[in-house]
């Protein structure tokens, strides 16, 4: 197979992905005789969604892990699937209907759900098609959807079990309510941002007249409309201004109700007036106060956020914000408005509707998070124990604190949503006015049977609500493995092999909403942990650290980075759908300034390498497009290095049939140079590093190790050294070098494959047969490299380090003397003759030398600059500008003296010597010795020039 002259990623990607998939290379391993199993769960994206940068990053990490373990011979499963995404999907379909002037209520539940299924079938494949563009290798044959029949049965089964155990209940509680959607929403679906508002100061008169100089208590509130539902005013029990008033009552303005003054240390004495109105039905903090003090709860808003009939007649039916204006006017008219001050406050809004979220007291279904189960432990306690015992490990470890903190302060989980798209709650009610009995069952027939046992044989009505999307997501670790109610008596190979899975890769933003709930539900239902490790990564942001969002106009599409996009198309994409013309204009201008030529096509491998390199521990990941360019250059470098190897090895005797290992070094067939042994030794170190970094989930360090070996060691040094050996070596040396070129390159391709699958597959297909390692049809199934530490060669490594230092010194001399790179110069070198003679051919090639003259000593009368490289003195024969050379050496002496002073200071510091690692202290001593030795050689040189 002939290799193309240049790397064209699009053609390679289009060819190889269908090949991998059609050959079954992504299929789950189900060999139960193999004790090694690796499983990873794809956090299910919204079924009708599209791929964003967070997906691209997350999936690159998961695919790298999957390919790595697959190549190590593990049974491997990357479990893919999508989420029905209740709210998000329902909103999309409702908007489509709105455009036609139809509401979901016009259609009715059954027909509306049919429409959603139609939309799911139409757009549901978009994100999985995009995942394929990223080169991901999940077992697509096992793809799951949270509303598949099997997963839906699991949802019902777990709900019924938890209800029968008393761990699911229905009750009236305060929840986040989105009045535009008409449903409860989770904390994750609420975005709080600082906005400009006001702090209204309202006086509540004492019921029995003034107390001393006080006519009443003045409260400060940002929401005066909720005062209609006030049931108390609270003060801090130790506040000297008000403590004596606790137990008295005030008259609630506009409502003519008397409410008590209570003491509670929740009150911040320094904020506002130190008096706080208490509205338990419309504020989460007040709700907790209400429970502590056994206060009544008065809902003064309907579910559509209009004032309810529990409020004074004048305000009934008003929108909450209209009511606010009228109430403020009425308070002012009665002389009870003590003041208004501008105030910045956090306003909670629905992330999809932007409607202000209303804390609302409604009937909902809940999971009891802290109630002991049959075994005496709550599901939360079990989840805490899993991590405390080390059964589940977090990487980085600091996320354990976040996990524990949330679980230790957990509230019961509201799992019902007032939607039509989702898993309908399996609960049936007696369809009789005044009968509140409910029967939870697997189906209606079972519900009727349960009702009959309770003496009810009338008509049943199913609960209209559906379950929170996170409920079915919490079951993902076992529902996707075809768990059934008969488990463990009836199981299957996948469930036996892959529960628990090996690692969960997730962003820190869903530790509470998904990670903790998977631990709770999986442990409680199956008795097993869902996964052993949790790798928590940061969130992808733009180069300035800003969150990527449509409104900011800084969103990047991974597919655009792979394929490229013109400036016109990018501007059009970023401004599409924006309602504000000024905002659209600003975003277009910014986009054209940032990307005047658009975005070039980087290809999948360059993008994946970029994502891996950015996977550092931390909360934020700044995505810099220039990194993509750098890694595209890396791919080109690897491609060109392979072309060089093929040009020099195809049709040549590469010694591949010769015996491998140390014995080959002593045969006439193969004569390995110190350069050959060095690159093999460095490869072992790199393989060991990469393995350790994979174990530690340090993908940034995996990419760094691969990059530095390929670019810095193999391409920049070994290939150049190999050119010398191929041109001037004996047949046995040439054969050994060709063998090394091939074997190391083939190994490197396998080493890099998990990160950059397409280019490595394409190159491997050509290189592997020449390297004698083509024992499978794809690099995906080739064995992953493992370090052989017996092949470390410290002597060869030391020689190359010395050679690099000499070459570097020669290059510095050329640069300082402004010698053209094209001009070959003679070098005079003083030092150990046998060593310098062995280096000479390499020096001539790498430092552009016409000859290397080895001498015992460089004469003191020489005026050409003399540089020191370790134990050698080097001089290029060239006409010298004495003054300039004197200045150069003087500067170098001054620099070295400064470095020597720093090193001496460090070593004189007892704290440094005592506390620093011994290796660090030794390094500092060696640096000092090096400075001293170099200065001893440079000072005479300066004296010599000064004497002229």
UniProtKB/Swiss-Prot annotation:
Catalysed reactions listed for this entry: tRNA(Val) + L-valine + ATP = L-valyl-tRNA(Val) + AMP + diphosphate
Chain ranges for the short sequence motif 'HIGH' region as given in the UniProt record: 45-55
Localization (cell): Cytoplasm
Extent of the signal sequence: none
InterPro entries found in the cross-reference section: aa-tRNA-synth_I_CS, aa-tRNA-synth_Ia, Anticodon_Ia_Val, M/V/L/I-tRNA-synth_anticd-bd, Rossmann-like_a/b/a_fold, tRNA-bd_arm, tRNAsynth_Ia_anticodon-bd, Val-tRNA_synth_C_sf
BP GO annotations: valyl-tRNA aminoacylation
GO cellular component, one term: cytosol
Primary subcellular site in the record, as a coarse category: cytoplasm
Disulfide bond annotation, renumbered to this chain: none
Any Pfam family matching the protein: Val_tRNA-synt_C
Enzyme Commission numbers on file: 6.1.1.9
Residue runs in coiled coils: 877-912
Binding site for ATP: 550
Motif mapping: 'KMSKS' region: 547-551
UniProtKB keywords: Aminoacyl-tRNA synthetase, ATP-binding, Coiled coil, Cytoplasm, Ligase, Nucleotide-binding, Protein biosynthesis
PROSITE patterns attached to this UniProt entry: AA_TRNA_LIGASE_I
A molecular-function term among this protein's GO annotations: aminoacyl-tRNA deacylase activity
Family: Belongs to the class-I aminoacyl-tRNA synthetase family. ValS type 1 subfamily.
Domain remark from Swiss-Prot or TrEMBL: ValRS has two distinct active sites: one for aminoacylation and one for editing. The misactivated threonine is translocated from the active site to the editing site.
Function: Catalyzes the attachment of valine to tRNA(Val). As ValRS can inadvertently accommodate and process structurally similar amino acids such as threonine, to avoid such errors, it has a 'posttransfer' editing activity that hydrolyzes mischarged Thr-tRNA(Val) in a tRNA-dependent manner.
Assembly, per entry: Monomer.
Protein name as annotated: Valine--tRNA ligase
